[in-house]
Amino acid sequence: GGYDRKRDLEDAMLCAAPGMKKNGFLRLGGGEFSLPYTVICGCHPRKTVLITAAVHGGEYVGIQAAVELADKLKPEKIHGRVILVKTVCRKEFEERSGSICPEDEKNLNRVFPGNPQGTRMDRLAYEVVQKLHSAADYYIDLHSGDDYEQLTPYIYYAGCADEDVVQMSRKMAEQADVPYMVKSNVASGGSYNYAAACGIPSVLIERGQMGGWSPEEVHSTRKDVRNILCALGVYDGMRS
């Protein structure tokens, strides 16, 4: 009847045994997209936090922070589940094409919620919504400045959503050690904006610039994420 083996397989990829960590490639869109990911399941059931990097393929601070978080977060300290997708725009990252997909000349973070019948970025956005947003209770999206962007570290929080979602998004943003906090005023286009409009408290961290990264920037982003996880009760520990 309604048995969908492919969908069941995709759902199973986002699960691990309690107290375990699983690494692999998440196949989306019938195999069109293959995204490196880690899922860490704690021993205690609670909420799921989705963390994504490389929604823009040339923003390296978030990628390296996600790689290190996947390595350093300890399953025994997790209450719930953490899903880390280390490179959403994997092909664009590998081809060093920055924030624009050469195939359709679209910016992934402008086309959410996507369209399964659209061009490449439309299809990827649709798959992210269907398979990743749908699994999340909270969402942290990691960005930095592309090779033409200078910026001071800051954090966006969702502003166009139900009031309880906005307030929780702001609470998440307050955990980040950045000079500026910005309330978003759009409900679609961006991955985290659309997730929030669907009821998922969401933030976007910006740190790093001009297509570069440093160990200090990566460490700061890791610390911000850890502090958000602690504030959500998903990770054991004190604010650092």
Name each region found by the language model.
Residues 1-240:
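Structured catalytic-domain cores with a bias toward divalent-metal coordination
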